[in-house]
Amino acid sequence: MAPSEGSIEEPFTVLAELKRQGLVRHLGLSNVSREQLAEAQAITEIVCVQNFYNLAHRHDDGFIDELAHRGLAYVPFFPLGGFTPLQSSALDAAAAALEATPMQVALAWLLQRSPNILLIPGTSSVGHLRENLRAATLRLPAEMIAGLDLIGARERTAP
C-alpha cells in the first residue's frame, strides 16, 4: 500500500494547533512518504510514523533505518498480512525450527529488525495475546534472519 499523495500541511496545521493548546500531547503520521514527514516536521514535532510494513512487504526498509537514526518510532501496520504460499512455507520452516507459530516468527523478525519498531498486533483473545507476547521472547539466529529477509527481497527489487 503506497503512502497517500499530496500535501498534509493544512490538516496537520490544525493538529499542531490542538497540540499547542494542550489538547493533544504527541503527534504521529500514518501512510506517509518521506516528503510528507518533512512537511509535518516543519510544522511541529513528530514522534512516530505508521506505514504498511511486514516481512513480505518491505518498501520502507530504508525509511525505517532513517527514522531510527533520528530517534523516531516506526509502527508497522498490517504486520502479519500478505504472505504468498511460497513465502509462508519459508516462514513455516523457521517456525518449526523454533517451535513457534509462523506469526510469532514474523513478529519476532519485526522486533529484531530495528530498535525503533513498535508493534501493535491485533489480538482477539487472551490466548492470542499470550501467543503474540511469546514473539518478544524469540531470538532469531542471524542465518534465520538472512533466510527470512529473502521473503521480501523480490518485492524490494521490483521497479
What are these regions (language model features)?
Residues 2-159:
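Beta/alpha (TIM)-barrel catalytic core signal, keyed to glycine-rich beta->alpha loops juxtaposed to Asp/Glu
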